[in-house]
Amino acid sequence: MKKFFLVIVLILVASGVFLLVNHQLKLMKYDFKGDSINGPVTMKSFDGEYKIAYFGYVFCPDVCPTTLTLVATALDDLKYKDVKILFATLDIKRDDVKTCDEFAKYFYPNSTCLRFDDKELDRVTKSYGVKYQIVDLKDSVMKYSVAHSSSIYLFDKKGRFVKEVSNLTYENVKKEIENLIKNH
């Protein structure tokens, strides 16, 4: 009987350790070290606010303005004030922190631009599953464009990943933000 009890205790301890390590790995997967208008930041810098992460770039002609407008409209309609949009630039050659931050705040005042170095951008986009590619535009003043995926990523107030939202209709985005606030 003692052996059985000991085995059960060991299984419970091992399960607890596994769950704790797994939880820490999930938190690390979505963490980052970047620059913002206020200096260096990590996901923890935004604790206390719900977060919506979005990857794009300032010179984006269509997807970024549309997505940021859609998210901002849903947030305004829901009247949620403690939600931060984290706009992570994919164009680190052209987007400086100040211009990027102004761009994000144009759509939603409680936004922050995140700018990463090459290595961190590569790591973060892989962790989040963001797809992007620099596309040469030979006969354009812009020289290149950035083709990219358009999902938004929802996080609770402690920086825990909640959901990736790729169906970016107004109704769906509003519903997913409501679910984030009500359930997390």
Model-based region annotation:
Residues 68-124:
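Structural microenvironment flanking redox-active thiols in thiol-disulfide oxidoreductases
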Residues 44-65, 71:
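Short active-site neighborhood of thiol/selenol oxidoreductases, capturing the structured segment around
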Residues 17-47, 69-70:
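N-terminal "domain-start" segment that seeds a small globular fold
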Residues 122-176:
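Thiol/disulfide oxidoreductase modules built on the thioredoxin-like
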Residues 181-184:
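Extracytoplasmic/luminal low-complexity segments enriched in Pro/Gly and acidic/polar residues
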Residues 29, 47, 82-85, 147-150:
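Extracytoplasmic
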Residues 55, 90, 157:
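Cofactor-binding loop segments of dinucleotide-utilizing enzymes, especially the Rossmann-like FAD-
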Residues 5-20:
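Hydrophobic membrane-insertion alpha-helices, especially the h-region
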